[in-house]
């Protein structure tokens, strides 16, 4: 009996033990499920994408992106990208805000990761006919990987300065003017000047037109901003440049707009400019026209060193220029933007004498320009953007110097320089030179994702020159200039990398430069017939620029480039009357590095504080210089040799208060001749390791500006005291 009871108890204990194990398993599974649920609920969904302008498609910097399920938010980076994380929910809403744009809200169904691209529509505040749209383009440029200075509209608005005066206050930039309106000027960036500098208007190379249009011809009231690139030129600009580039961005006017301005200055200088724009909202067609008329007498008294300091009046240096154009732009066709432009440029500039009183000689030119622009986002493929430009320039220009009398400063009549006339050279001239140029630029950018992007740029230029000056040929007794052609092409492929939520940026570009020319050349030491000269060459270049942001305000920039500059048409094939062809001219090549530190802080009141330090080194090979020729009063371009540049620049500027803006900058640049021997000989170079003459090595600017809006009442007015 006892055994039976013991067995029963044993069975009962086993059953209890079994039930206990089952309960513990059940509890363990319950805890595991709860832990899994908690773990799953703790998992996050990543929401990323890009914020762009609904009208232009350009990225919007510093747009504020927030999620309904998360009280925190994030600002978009320099490419307009954002990335936020939220707890895994079935759905939520995304809110995007930016000053100057309508707030956008979007409902999202969540998964492991969601890509949401947002387009913001600008809000337009009409102030006496002026559309005010807030942009962050300047900040985007300043925080890019390339060394760059940006002159914004705030620095241009309300000033009577011209572009050259504004550029001269920029760190590392020197501007040399030979006189007043219409006179030649040379822009130098870090000691490299002239044709090494790329000149662009709205990212379009000036090319041949740079011989007839100067930056000073553009009124400052038509300019949105000026970008000064140092060393590296953006791949999307096309063409070739070594010292850097100046890109003038003109204003985008409101749908209905009329502007008229008149400026008067010293030396009887006058400039009239006007802009008219109308828009048909239904069809999306925009019609615009505008023009600039410039005139200057440029008369003043001067002391002549060759006449023992005698004071005479400079009275034959007047300048007249007319620029006018019309445009039609469509924004609702298959292309996001399709624009056609027609432009006329006409110039007449008198020539002033120094040794003698020149009274009749002058230069003249007339150019007709037609241009087509096509832009399309998501061009047959999501993320692929097309930007296409084509232009054709037809010009006629020359020197007119055929007076049959000359005069000294006492008014005495002298014979001309040749039996056929002429005042200034050793020959008479009545030039009717013709030039034609076709330019095509195609830029295609493909955004793979928020980290990777590719860009292909193709730039082609075909230039032909047909010199015609029978009077000069008669005076010389032979023909010195001949028809010539030049073709150039630049192909660039770039890769952009963005990491660590936009803190790190890197842009690598590989380029191939191709050019060919066909001309004829004479041997001044013999009586042989002109010999045909053909040239065809290609070169490889590359550049890399990177930027890392330690904080939102402090960043490090570094860049390296090995570039090639193809000679311009004027350097390679001449101009038909004073510059001879140089078909054997070699392209300039450069290798350089830049290291910089930028602190850029936006104050609570919207003011800006900037401090930037840069160090740079550059080695220029086959430098091209303008030198006299054996033919009297003629010149040609020749390769000079090697030049080394090194230096440092420091700039500080900021809004001390809403009324006061201070700036100061300084540059030390050391340019040395590093040729071992004189070109074409084995003779040791006597100027080796000596500074290049006429290039300043120490530059400094400082100043203050007082700003006051609506000082004299009204709205939208800005008064500045420099």
Label every model-predicted segment.
Residues 117-118, 218-257:
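A beta-strand signature from Gram-negative outer-membrane beta-barrel systems
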Residues 610-611, 616-619, 638-722:
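Gram-negative outer-membrane beta-barrel transporters
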Residues 327-346, 365-526, 531-551, 559-561, ...:
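Face-selective signature of the C-terminal outer-membrane beta-barrel domain
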Residues 255, 263, 280-359:
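Periplasmic-side early beta-strands and strand-to-turn transitions of outer-membrane beta-barrels
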Residues 82-85, 204-230:
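Short acidic/polar hinge/loop motifs at secondary-structure boundaries
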Residues 549, 557-561, 588-646, 667, ...:
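Membrane-embedded beta-barrel scaffold of Gram-negative outer-membrane proteins
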Residues 50-56, 64-68, 97-101, 111-157, ...:
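Short, acidic, small-residue-rich periplasmic hinge/interaction motif at the N-terminus
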Residues 148, 159, 164-205:
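Extracytoplasmic beta-strand/coil segments of soluble accessory domains associated
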